[in-house]
Amino acid sequence: MAEEHETRPPSAGRPPSSGRGRADDADEREEGEIADDDSGHAPPQANPAAPHPLEHAWTFWFDNPQGKSKQATWGSSIRPIHTFSTVEDFWSLYNNIHHPSKLVVGADFHCFKNKIEPKWEDPICANGGKWTFSCGRGKSDTMWLHTLLAMIGEQFDYGDEICGAVVSVRGKQERIAIWTKNAANEAAQISIGKQWKEFLDYKDSIGFIVHDDAKKMDKGLKNRYTV
């Protein structure tokens, strides 16, 4: 099993400071440009507090195992937590929620594009599938964060194919999966799987399972794609 690495993928990280020194401004001033404004008006300044919007809004969902029953329909206990659409909102939420290693066994924590529910029955998910990898208990925190950053930061070439991601905490392991829209689009699925492994520096093979195949609950279920 691959070990965790602390390097982050290119992603929607914390926003850089917009402040610049006067020496930098002078170096970048073109020849003949007037240095001082004699109009009496202060030059426009960038607002360092301005939010950094994401390309898509995303929603965190939580499936509480304590709210499940054996008779309940699958997915009936999933509840939306909060929707965010800026880098700042993401970090505010992420820094104030339990990370996978702190979740109870049986919990599922999702991050999906807004208005897409993390269910097979959702029309956008219905024809898709998921890439999945597993790791030991308590070892998924860093990989979950890197997955989120790569996803909301639009680092995937086929990002439009991605519905969202989920981390699932089980008795002996934790699983992270990326859900996609169209399982039949092999080029997109292979690209997403390969890039995901690169972002995580994950060396083991991962498999892609089609949702329609997973519904059959076949113990001999095989991966449609492997990278």
Swiss-Prot record:
PTM per Swiss-Prot/TrEMBL: According to the redox status, the Cys-125-Cys-163 disulfide bridge may have a role in regulating protein function by affecting its ability to bind capped mRNA.
InterPro entries to which the protein is assigned, alphabetical: TIF_eIF4e-like, TIF_eIF_4E, TIF_eIF_4E_CS
GO terms under cellular component: cytoplasm; eukaryotic translation initiation factor 4F complex; nucleus
Subcellular location, record wording: Nucleus; Cytoplasm
Record keyword RNA-binding present: yes
Pfam families, alphabetized: IF4E
Gene3D superfamilies: RNA Cap, Translation Initiation Factor Eif4e
Membrane-crossing segments per the record: none
UniProt biased composition (Acidic residues): 25-37
Keywords: Cytoplasm, Disulfide bond, Initiation factor, Nucleus, Protein biosynthesis, RNA-binding, Translation regulation
Region of interest called EIF4G-binding, as start-end residue ranges on this chain: 52-55, 62-98, 146-155
Positions bound to mRNA: 70-75, 102, 120-121, 170-175, 215-219
GO biological process: defense response to virus; regulation of translation; translational initiation
Chain positions covered by the region annotation Disordered: 1-52
Function, in words: Component of the protein complex eIF4F, which is involved in the recognition of the mRNA cap, ATP-dependent unwinding of 5'-terminal secondary structure and recruitment of mRNA to the ribosome. Recognizes and binds the 7-methylguanosine-containing mRNA cap during an early step in the initiation of protein synthesis and facilitates ribosome binding by inducing the unwinding of the mRNAs secondary structures.
Subunit (UniProt): EIF4F is a multi-subunit complex, the composition of which varies with external and internal environmental conditions. It is composed of at least EIF4A, EIF4E and EIF4G. EIF4E is also known to interact with other partners. In higher plants two isoforms of EIF4F have been identified, named isoform EIF4F and isoform EIF(iso)4F. Isoform EIF4F has subunits p220 and p26, whereas isoform EIF(iso)4F has subunits p82 and p28.
Family to which this protein belongs: Belongs to the eukaryotic initiation factor 4E family.
Protein known as: Eukaryotic translation initiation factor 4E-1
